[in-house]
Structure formats: structure tokens, C-alpha cells
Amino acid sequence: MRVSYNWLKDYVKVGLSPQELAERLTARGVVVENVVRANPGVEGVVVGRVVAMERHPNADTLWVCQVDVGGGRVLQILTGAQNVTVGALVPAAVPGAKLPGGVTMGVKKLRGLDSHGMLCSEAELQVGDDADGILILPPEPGLEPGMDVAEVLGLNDWIFELDLTANYAAHCQSMLGVAQEVAALVGGEVNRPSTYTPDAPGTDVRNLIAVQIDAPDLCSRYVARVVRGVKIGPSPLWLQARLRAAGMRPINNIVDIANFVMLETGQPLHTFDYAQIRGQRIIVRRARTGERFTTLDGQERVMDESVLVIADAERPVALAGVMGGEDSEVTDQTADILIESAHFDNINNRRTSLRYNLPSEASKRFTKGVDPSGCVAAADRAAQLMAELAGGTVVAGHVDVCPRPAVPPVILLRTERANALTGLKLTPERMAEHLRSLGMAVLTPADLAADLALGAPESDEEPGEDLGGHPVWTALHQVSPVPSDPVVYRTWAEAAWAEVEDAGSRLEALLGGGESDGKAAASGEGVSPGGASDGILVVVVPTRRSDVAVEVDLIEEIARCEGYDAIPLELPVLSSHRGGRSRQGEVKLAARRALAAAGLTEVLTHSLTHPRVYDMLALPEDDPNRRCLALANPMYEDRSTLRTMLLPCLLDVVRYNANRQVRDLAIFEISHVYRPVEGEQLPDEPLMIGLAMTGNLAPLGWNSPERPADFFALKGVVEHLLAELGVPDARFERSAHPSLHPGRQAALVVGGKPVGLLGELHPQVQERWELPGRVYVAELAFAPLMEAMLPQAVYRPVPRFPAVTRDVAVVVDLDLTAHRLETAIREAGGDLLEEVRLFDVYQGERVAEGRRSLAYRLVYRAADRTLTDEELEPVHNRVREALKALGAELRS
């Protein structure tokens, strides 16, 4: 934001140089990125009056002008501009004058005639972009030939370029907001401009325009005023200078006044040609789906119900807070002006601005936050200036529709807590001084008790009546403008008194009463002038300070007013107790290390996705994973719901890499998914482990072939993870998940409960995701694995005695799983059986159809002796008998 130093001095006595002011503002948190001269290098250019002109005898496109440049001098200056007329006041760069870029003017011969300097355009003075004609200065009292153009155009100024952070974006996006900060800095007062304009007798504005708000959630206030009989023309030079200093281009007096008031107060305004408002009615409503509207830039906009529009009785006339329409814009023929001063929802306004790519100073302010209490004052200021600068007559009264009046918050500040948090040692009086300098009202608990003891003011009181006897109630009327409309005021008064009562309840709770309905505070109990309440300040915050909502916000304001440099340097008091990870954190780290050791790369994916991914995964309509949480206001269509699975996110990563010729990939992610819970407001957020492998796991080498990813490689990674975590009693069972290949998938079961799936991606799912090769995926629930882990690792000493190996081969039916066979072998082998390994599988012509041959290697060992054949043979026979019991045929 650009702030003019000269303009700032209209509102506050600065008393500091521009550079010093910039440094001190930055130290208070209002960051001044740069201080630059407003003058781009214009020196010696004066105001000239064209007293005579004629065509150049040797050039049809040139004019020979006689220009009065003051001091009794009339110079001959030649120009090719076609907008110059006799009597026009123009910038004349006389010999010796300097223009931006370091050009020094002299006498130059053009087609045989001398030109003593030149007449300047906006572009040549670098005060605008218009290079087609000479800058014509509007005739004003006191504007005479010979005056310094830099002074006339307001170029002898300094410009502060502010970088407003979120804490200052709302209240510092106006000249008065910055002036309040400067006043607090230098200990002065803000000189707010008067908005008084005598209303024209006769018609009331309510007889000329009616306002209806059909979308109160998107528009909390709409104020309208009417000014009749205006004359459209150029703005006075002082107003043009103010706009240029702020980086805006002057257009005409009506548009310039609206922009000036926005820059001064922070409240965006819009002006309509009153004659074009059909039915003399304004309706603030949502657009209808498919409704069309042509904005001021000539573009037709197609709208839907998410767009807020300002409409008359027949059609939209503006995109609310963004841009007006062609049909109601102010033109040179406009005589009557309808002024709009409203408060629109910041999120909806930003979304509309982005949707139609219509950034503007108005939408920027609505997005960051505008004071809803300032609507009437801004409309009055604009009406005043239109009467003064455009010759208009202000119609009496306002139309003020306000379904949700803004009430200044009442915040309780504990002074001891403020000192404890900041490290400062300020008195309550010093804190109150800082807060009052920012336009806040500071009272005592006794004042609040007095309000509550007196009770609510009479409901028929009007704003401006005597408010004596109610200190906090009076402050609520003073820190921000209150509604002038009686109906709106009564609504405001109810909400304001509710704020007073709530403050009383909070005060009683602070003084030790716990939860309260405020009755004790109302009677004055525990709120005496002395005692515990001495350390509490009751602060009423203006509505323009939307960033100050709770106690710590006040503490921040006190700290920056006192100066961050005043905060003492103290080492923090550290606890001797060392922090550590939670058990979940430890297990998660162990899982990450195990998967990384297995050769997988960790990825982090976005937790937002789109419901169509579940169609791509071929999930049935009743699958629980389709029940996902949708965002109320998604920024992007593809990021509209919270994920219920990691699988689609991992497939997105595989596709992204494949599109960039990375076909060999092994990745994992350990992240949360989000699943709605029936009857609960918040979802379940289980932690999941996701794996994905594709391409080759090992490249082609001089001594080894490529090793492509397959189901068993994926299964091996899962087994490695289980072993590293110490998860016993895990097995793999057949499964039938629709996203996976029907013959190459399995369910992981731990402790008799399914905890995950693994397998090859179904070919149709692979095709929908446009993946070039086979992809192997797994998704495991983290919590059941953590619960099943052994409490601690069991140490086994290095074996001292040799092992004995025996092989056993069996022929079994195809439906008898290897897991059942291995379980039977281990149970029969007992403590002496150390290892069971399947080393051969055969299915072919030497084995009957429907059967297969499995060969196992069994390793036996005793911890305290060498096993003999006599000891081993009975154990091995038990293994054979156990296999026979399952229907296995032993092979020799």
C-alpha cells in the first residue's frame, strides 16, 4: 500500500522526517518497505496558459503556440498535440527545465521555427500513461501561469510503501488507519474530516430508493445515499494529486471521489447512475445459475448461486464489491448519483474476484476486512465531496439495512498476565495509555459493575441521547459509529448489551466465581475498586480493529506500543525433564527406517482428493471408503474431499513419475486418512501405511539380470516390516478386493484380525490411471500393527551347538495353503524346530491334477547340546504325522 506523507499530515501532526517516521513505524510492526520521492524528476516545469496558436507554416501536424509562462514572459512553443486550445492551462517545460530521465530542455528548431521548450503530456511527466495529448490542467482559483507544476501536481511529496501483514491489513489499509498509528506513535490526536452536509429540504431518500438484502450471510450491511444534479467533469488538482500518490489514475470527479473516500476511510464505495436503477430498488442477492451480466470492462459474465450480485428490480447491476455493470455506470450525461456503501463477506468476495480475474483496490480491501461500522460515515463523506466538487444536492437521509450490526468487543485484560507474557514491568496506567492512543476505551471493573447494576438502558432510547451513568455502554457508543437508523440501532443495542452482560460473566469467572450468569457482577460483588479487580482493565475495542478479539491481542498491542526494543533480554527457564517421542512416534520412526532399509523412498502426498478416484478404483457404491468428508469451500475442484485411502494418492505419484519417464519406482507413505463417524462431528483419523512398487527393483548389471517388482517382492517388504516391528502371529489369506488383480492379492491378518491388503493393481484400474506397467500396492492399518508388537525385543545368544537339517516333501490339494502346512510343522516340531523354509513348489504332469508338490527345509537345534539322531527322529516323525493328518502325501 502507498501512503502519501503530505496527505498523512492532513490528519495528524507528524513532527518527524519521512525517514524517521518510516523507521519508527517499522519498529511498531507497520512495515515500511521503502520511502521514495513522489517526484520522478520534474524540475523547472511551470504552468503555462496558451494565449494564441496557429498552424505551423511548414507542417500540417504542428501548432505554433504562444504560451504565457508567468513573470510577463510569453514563449513560442511548438506542439503536435491536437487537444490544445487557446486559454488552456498546460505544463510548460521551459528552457532549463528537467524531465524524468535527466532530459534538460532548451531551444530547438522545428521545421524552421524555434520552440522554446515543450508542452508536456502525462506520460512525459510520468504522472500517468496518456501520451496522446497534452495534460490539460483544470482551471481553479489561484492557479496562475508560472506556478511550479511539481507543486501543483503534488509531486513534492514522499511515498511510503507499506508491506501490511495480517495483523495490520484491515485497519491500516486506509489513510485514517495509518494516521491512528502515527498519532499513537507521536502522542497526538487524529483529525478526522467532517462529513456534515446540509440535506436538501423536501424529499427523503427512502422515497427514492428501497434496499432489500436477500443474502444476509454474504452482506451484513448496505447503506445508500442519493446526490442529485451533479456535473461530471475533471477533479480538482489536489484530489488528482492524492489519487496519483496512492497509485490510482484520476478519471472524473464522481469516480475520483469514491476512490478518494475508499483510500481515506478504507471503506470501498460504488456509484450508480440513479436514473438507470429500474424500479428504484436495490436487491442484494445471490445470482441465479446461468444468469448473465456485463461488467464495466465490457465482458459478459456467466454466474451461478455462489456469486453475490447487486440487482435492481429487473437485472443485476454490479458484482458485489468487485465491479459494476455497463448498464448503470456513471457517464458524462449522469445527473443523479446513487452511492453504495456496504459490507460484504470477505471470503465470497475474494472467490468472485479470483473467479472472474477482476482484482481491484475495492475487492482487496473487502478480502482483508472492512469496518462494518464505517459504512454510513463513508457514504456521508462521499456525498459531502460530491456536493462540494460536483455541484450536487444531497437528498436527506440514508437507507441503512443492517441485519447483523457489528458491536465493539469488550475484552478483559489482566495486567499481571500482560507483564508476564511480555517480560515488561508496566503499570496499569501505562497500559491504558497505550490502548487509548489506538482509539480504544479503557475502563475498570467498577465501571462494568455500575453498568450491570443500572441494568439495560430503555429500548426506546435513540443514538445520541444522554448515556450518563453507564460507563461501558457510553464507551460502546464512542469507539465506533453507531447506527443512525432507529430500527438498526435497536438491533445493535440488544447485541451491545449482551456483550456487556457477557463481559460481566467473564469478569466474575476471573475473580474466582467460575461459570456465572453475571448476577454477582451486576450486584457489584467481588468488583470493588480495590482488591483483585485492581489488576484488570475493561477494554472496549473499535470494530475497525478486527484483529483484536482476545486478551493476547491487547497484550501484543501494548508490547508494540511500548516498543519491542524495551522487552528485556532474559534466558528462558528450561525444564530439566527431557522431552521425547510418543510410542506412536517411536513405532512410526521404526517403520519408516524399516521401509527405507528395504529400498523404498518415502513420499508425502496431499490429503485432499476428488470423489472420482473411488470410481477409478472400481469400488462398489456401498464401499465405506466412498463416505468421505467434503470441503464446504474447496479452492480447487480436484481437492474437494478428504481422502479415506492412501492408495489413490500413491497412484498419483506413480503416474506423475511415469509421465516423466521414471518407470522404476518403490515408494511408501505413513499418513492419516479421514473417515466420517456416524453421529460424531469430527472424523476418525487412522494412521495408515501405504506401499507402491513398479518397474524394476534392481537394474540390469554385468553380473546380474534385472529384478522386476512382483507380488512376492511386495510381500517380502511387508514381511520385513513386520519382522522389524516385532509383530508375531501374522499370516496372509486370500482376498477379493475389486481394485486388485483377482489372482495376485492377499489380506494381511494379525492376531486373527485383518489389518491390510496387498497385491497387484487390477488391469482395468491400471488402465484408468494411465499407468504404463504393472503396479504392486499395499495399504496397512498402523494402529493394529502397533498393538500387536511384542512389548520388547527378546535377546537370543549366538547358538553354541550345531543345527541339524531335514527336508520333507508333500503332495497336497491346491486348496490347502502353505500357511496351514507351516503351522502344523511348527506345532509338531516344538522347541527344537528353529526354522521352516519352503524351498520348492511343483505343479505339473508328474503330480495329479488339482494337486501340487511342496518341499520344506526344517532346521532343528538345541540350545544346550548337540542333537543326536535318536533324539531327532521322534520329533521329525511327529512332523510327518501332522502333515498326514492334513491329507498330505509324503514323497520319498
Swiss-Prot record:
GO molecular function: ATP binding; catalytic activity, acting on a protein; magnesium ion binding; phenylalanine-tRNA ligase activity; transferase activity; tRNA binding
Broad class of where this protein is predominantly found: cytoplasm
Cofactor note: Binds 2 magnesium ions per tetramer.
tRNA-binding domain location: 39-150
Record's keyword annotation contains Nucleotide-binding: yes
One GO cellular component term: phenylalanine-tRNA ligase complex
SUPFAM superfamilies: Anticodon-binding domain of PheRS (SSF54991), Class II aaRS and biotin synthetases (SSF55681), Nucleic acid-binding proteins (SSF50249), PheT/TilS domain (SSF56037), Putative DNA-binding domain (SSF46955)
Names of required cofactors: Mg(2+)
Gene Ontology terms describing biological process: phenylalanyl-tRNA aminoacylation
SMART domains: B3_4, B5, FDX-ACB
The keyword ATP-binding is assigned to this record: yes
EC number(s) reported in the record: 6.1.1.20
Pfam family, one: B5
Region (Insert): 442-518
UniProt keyword list: Aminoacyl-tRNA synthetase, ATP-binding, Cytoplasm, Ligase, Magnesium, Metal-binding, Nucleotide-binding, Protein biosynthesis, RNA-binding, tRNA-binding
First-tier enzyme category under EC: ligase
Domain FDX-ACB as annotated: residue spans: 799-891
Residues involved in Mg(2+) binding: 547, 553, 556-557
Localisation per UniProt entry: Cytoplasm
Superkingdom, natural source: Bacteria
Domain B5 span(s) in chain numbering: 406-569
Reactions it catalyzes: tRNA(Phe) + L-phenylalanine + ATP = L-phenylalanyl-tRNA(Phe) + AMP + diphosphate + H(+)
Subunit-structure text: Tetramer of two alpha and two beta subunits.
Family: Belongs to the phenylalanyl-tRNA synthetase beta subunit family. Type 1 subfamily.
Protein name as annotated: Phenylalanine--tRNA ligase beta subunit
Origin species: Symbiobacterium thermophilum (strain DSM 24528 / JCM 14929 / IAM 14863 / T)
